[in-house]
Structures are given as structure tokens and as C-alpha cells.
A protein has these predicted regions:
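Short, positively charged low-complexity motifs
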Residues: 12-20
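Short, Lys/Arg-enriched N-terminal segments with co-localized hydrophobic residues
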Residues: 22-32
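Entry/capping segment at the start of metal-dependent catalytic domains
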Residues: 31-54
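Conserved N-terminal beta-strand and adjoining loop/helix that marks the start
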Residues: 52-75
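Conserved hydrophobic "DFG−1" position in protein kinase catalytic cores
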Residues: 65-67, 77, 144, 166
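A glycine-rich, hydrophobic loop/mini-helix early in the fold
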Residues: 73-97, 101-106, 111
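Unchanged
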Residues: 96-222, 231-232, 236, 242-244
Length: 244
């Protein structure tokens, strides 16, 4: 053990103190040997430790699904049903990873559950960049393709999806999103122990500014995480120097 724990002082009459004439004098610090052993143990632990988030992350995956309509690629998007979180928002099929799943398995399963497209009919193309949210979530988008004949068989699960529609890839390639800033700030609970921190109630808690992106297409507002993912996909395509 790294911390030195002396034996309890003998307080019975007639028994000498193990610490000399002063019974309240306690040995402090580590001996050279104890220090060396402690360092070995710390080294053994951290030399093989794999770094991970201090806060446990919730993992999600979505499928940026493409199909071909009239000779050009379209993204398949959904509008969330009234009975789920963020009702009415436009999003990709996807959801929370279940125990034992890989993230790509999550994306494929959720797509089948939400819009009825069989996993065997989906051609996986790759993945775009992932996003870390302020809610301790990690969201991984995957890029995939289905033929138009398969897309026509898509049926929204009414418990989760109100509508399925498509937007041309070309629209996002040629359209700059609107940008609006939001500021996230700390709101302390009523019993927050201000007396324990320097500055008390005047402590300068950090604020976080986030730029929200907005696309509008045929009456649909696409914003939030979905807009961020679409913009990231477009940036990756543009960085490739290929013509689309």
C-alpha cells in the first residue's frame, strides 16, 4: 500500500508506545523502500491502462442512407413521430447501441425497425466523422446505399417515424446552411455548495457557444445533429477534390 498506516497506539497502562516517548508522534511519509514499491505499483497499473472517457459515454449510430432517383443521388431522411423525443425533427434512421452490438449493427437494425428496409438490402459504403455531444453521447454516422426499387418499399414505423422523404445530394453540395449561435451555460441546483468554491456565487462558470446549422428544403427544416452530419459529409466530399 502506498500510504503508511502505523499500528494503533497502545493506550493501556504499562504498555510503552511504539513511537517513543511521545505517544502522539506518528510516522509521516514513506520510507525509501516503500516509495520504491509504490512507484512500481503505479507504473504497473498505468503502463497497461487504456485511456477511456472519464464519464461513461452513451453510444449511438445513424445511417446516412442514399438512393438514386432520376439519375442523381438523394439522402433518405425521416421526420420523427409525435410520441418520441424531439418530435417533428428531421433525422437519419438510427438510435442507441444495445448490449453486444457494434455501432454499424446498431445503424442497420434501427434502419430496419424505423423504415422497414431489410439489412441485407443495404450496401454499406463507409462512415463519416463522429460527434461528441454535451449530453455525454457519441454518435457515429455510417454512409450506405439502397437501389430505388428497395427505397419504394420503405414503410415508416408509426411509433417512431411520421414521414420518409428524400433530398438530393446536389442540394447540400450547392447550398450553404444558415448559421445561428446558441450558448450553453451552467445552471446550478438550489443546494449547490457555493461556499466550497473560490468566488462563491460569483464563480465564473464556463459557457459554451455552438453554431447551429439550418437547411430548408420543400418545407422541411433540417437542423441540429442531422444538419451537422450532412455538412460534415459535404466537407469530406469537397476535400476529396472529386467532382460531384
Amino acid at each position: 500500500r502506498c500510504q503508511y498506516h502505523p499500528k494503533a497506539l497502545r493506550r493501556y497502562r504499562g504498555q510503552p508506545s511504539p513511537h517513543g516517548s511521545n505517544p502522539h508522534q506518528i510516522k509521516k511519509g514513506l520510507s525509501p523502500m516503500e516509495h520504491k514499491n509504490c512507484l512500481k505499483k503505479v507504473t504497473a497499473v498505468f503502463s497497461s491502462h487504456e485511456a477511456a472517457p472519464i464519464w461513461k459515454l452513451r453510444h449511438f449510430a445513424v445511417l446516412a442512407l442514399l438512393t438514386e432517383i432520376g439519375g442523381e443521388l438523394h439522402f433518405i431522411l425521416t421526420k420523427r413521430a409525435a410520441g418520441v423525443n424531439q418530435p417533428g425533427d428531421v433525422c437519419f434512421p438510427g438510435g442507441h447501441r444495445e448490449q453486444g452490438e457494434t455501432l454499424v449493427e446498431t445503424a442497420l437494425r434501427e434502419t430496419e425497425e424505423e423504415i422497414g428496409i431489410s439489412q441485407k438490402d443495404i450496401r454499406l459504403l463507409g462512415k463519416s466523422d463522429f460527434m461528441l455531444t454535451i449530453y455525454r453521447g457519441m454518435i457515429q454516422p455510417y454512409i450506405a446505399y439502397i437501389p430505388y426499387e428497395i427505397y419504394k418499399t420503405a414503410v415508416p414505423n408509426p411509433k417512431e417515424v411520421a414521414e420518409i422523404f428524400t433530398v438530393p445530394l446536389r442540394f447540400f453540395l450547392k447550398t450553404e446552411p444558415e448559421r445561428h449561435d446558441t450558448v450553453w451555460k451552467v445552471i446550478e441546483s438550489p443546494d449547490f455548495p457555493y461556499e466550497k468554491i473560490e468566488g462563491g456565487k460569483n464563480y465564473p462558470f464556463s459557457k459554451s457557444k455552438t453554431t447551429q446549422l439550418f437547411y430548408e428544403y420543400n418545407g422541411h427544416i433540417i437542423w441540429g445533429f442531422t444538419a451537422q452530419v450532412l455538412r460534415n459529409i459535404i466537407e469530406i466530399l469537397n476535400e476529396s477534390k472529386l467532382k460531384f
